[in-house]
Amino acid sequence: MSATGLGPVRCAFVLLLALCSRPASSQDCSAPCQCPAGPAPRCPAGVSLVLDGCGCCRVCAKQLSELCTERDPCDPHKGLFCDFGSPANRKIGVCTAKDGAPCVFGGTVYQSGESFQSSCKYQCTCLDGSVGCVPLCSVDVRLPSPDCPFPRRVKLPGKCCEEWVCDEPKEHTVVGPALAAYRPEDTFGPDPTMIRANCLVQTTEWSACSKTCGMGISTRVTNDNAFCRLEKQSRLCMVRPCEADLEENIKKGKKCIRTPKISKPIKFELSGCTSMKTYRAKFCGVCTDGRCCTPHRTTTLPVEFKCPDGEVMKKSMMFIKTCACHYNCPGDNDIFESLYYRKMYGDMA
């Protein structure tokens, strides 16, 4: 092989030697904690913000097949660990996935722990046979307002995500009178308690839980904030545990059990993290005649989760007060599932 051909090989070999011969203080935890000043780093979509392996600073977790050290840990929420190879060389490793089932998505096989972009709009991760995706584009909602009566999303050349634009007002349209009627009036206006500082507070009902069992997500849209801007809020929800066999609790002669009693308090789990408190939560039951039972009255409370790395995160979570059993049941994998569920009333938050 010519000297020219050996050039890239020699450079790669020198780089490998440099990585392996770096001082251990940059990888192990013998050095004192020195975190960068300022706010915590902002991680790319789908990448967890975790404490480093020394418990000092918040860092963006390393992903599958990336180099890792004791100070630069792998993403624990994706089942990754740092494989250092031989115990004699515990300085630099490679992020490796724990044993888990692969995923098939779009005709491509992905290993457990592997991240990929299904399109320019979504970042996805395979975790033990299941694929989860987070949007890369904004999912905000914008209603007509006096300063922007005709908002609409448009696809701009060279950009993947659609963006909001405000068209110029047009005469003799339906939107103009609608805006006038939308503003509060002394006699026929909305509840005065919902008006503050030129802002008509609007909040939608919470959507149905994204999962019929296990931990899911429920969302709503509100402008109840300092800037009176519409924003999407989310909360965790669990209609019922997946492992519970509720049909055996149905009394003889009955076809449904609406709110089964849980024998003992439980702790919730989220991405490997566990709630710090135990909860005697209510769940919705099941029917044997084709009806489904869903939350009817709920409330929203904060729940603190503690992760294996010591990080504590606080999440809003739905707690069920009452359930209703009905025939408006969605089909399996129905993307319009929330349209079939009855609305949830009396939510306190």
UniProtKB/Swiss-Prot annotation:
Pfam families: Cys_knot, IGFBP, TSP1_CCN, VWC. Residues 27-98 form the IGFBP N-terminal domain. It is found in: Secreted, Extracellular space, Extracellular matrix; Secreted. One of its GO terms (biological process) is DNA biosynthetic process. Residues 1-26 form the signal peptide. Disulfide bonds join 29-54, 33-56, 35-57, 43-60, 68-82, 74-95, 256-293, 273-307, 284-323, 287-325, 292-329. InterPro entries: CCN, Cys_knot_C, Glyco_hormone_CN, Growth_fac_rcpt_cys_sf, IGFBP-like, IGFBP_CNN, Insulin_GF-bd_Cys-rich_CS, TSP1_CCN. One of its GO terms (molecular function) is integrin binding. The keyword Secreted applies. Residues 198-243 form the TSP type-1 domain. Residues 247-349 are annotated as: Heparin-binding. Keywords: Cell adhesion, Disulfide bond, DNA synthesis, Extracellular matrix, Heparin-binding, Secreted, Signal. GO terms for cellular component: extracellular matrix; extracellular space; Golgi apparatus. Residues 101-167 form the VWFC domain. Monomer. Interacts with TSKU. Belongs to the CCN family. Major connective tissue mitoattractant secreted by vascular endothelial cells. Promotes proliferation and differentiation of chondrocytes. Is involved in the stimulation of osteoblast differentiation and has a critical role in osteogenesis. Mediates heparin- and divalent cation-dependent cell adhesion in many cell types including fibroblasts, myofibroblasts, endothelial and epithelial cells. Enhances fibroblast growth factor-induced DNA synthesis. This is CCN family member 2. The lineage of its organism: Eukaryota, Metazoa, Chordata, Craniata, Vertebrata. The gene is CCN2.
